[in-house]
Amino acid sequence: MEKQWWKESVVYQIYPRSFMDSNSDGIGDLQGIISKLDYLKELGIDVIWLSPVYESPNDDNGYDISDYCKIMNEFGTMEDWDELLHEMHERNMKLMMDLVVNHTSDEHNWFIESRKSKDNKYRDYYIWRPGKEGKEPNNWGAAFSGSAWKYDEMTDEYYLHLFSKKQPDLNWDNEKVRQDVYEMMKFWLEKGIDGFRMDVINFISKEEGLPAVETEAEGYVSGHKHFMNGPNIHKYLHEMNEEVLSHYDIMTVGEMPGVTTEEAKLYTGEERKELQMVFQFEHMDLDSGEGG
């Protein structure tokens, strides 16, 4: 049986902002990482998982991406990134990029266009709904507090944001969204990266109709059961594998809150052709009571 390199690799996450500052501006950067590659290699690290370095207004530490194919100025340039990849491969180390495609920044060009009008060609790249009786479309709460819906007066509708109001959710039911995401992934893979860590990837498929959570509680409540491991999640990940991932010798891991060990097998079984691994959080709650 042929060995798969990712099963035997030691992976180290680098949060670039706090890792190593090469120019004394108080912010870690790509050149700082390059300067420590020999040290990281000596520690026995095979793969670096690089937290987001894409262009971003930085509302959520880079997880609000305004351009997937540019590097945030604070971290350096694309030339610096190219040098990092080259120097890593020279040391027989591999680079895994963070893939954040449940949502973008509200400063991404897709969203800027989307909010201009209801008939804009990018409108359905995001999840827009009219209000109900002067309120939000449903009672879902956002991970960062408050409603998961933000009213936008330009078109008198609300957009869904499961996280920050500056992180509108992409509409994965729109095939054009999926194809644009796949093209972006190919951009980085053709540059030579060795894998993706996929941020909250099991949130991308929402239940049809976006139903409200049935509860006696007032205010905003978790809508997880209506978007976590949603109805088309396996269809979309299989499609991603078929169109992109299977064409490269890479490592893939999905961050998946709320996935049980049995459900994890559905995402990672080789015969299912989706992902190779998941971050599974069930064990984190073993000593938690009803209130957390």
Per-range role (PLM):
Residues 2-186, 190, 203-260:
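Acidic/aromatic-lined carbohydrate-recognition and catalytic surfaces
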Residues 48, 196-198:
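Hydrophobic residues within beta-strands of alpha/beta enzymes
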Residues 256-292:
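Noncatalytic carbohydrate-binding groove/subsite architecture in carbohydrate-active enzymes
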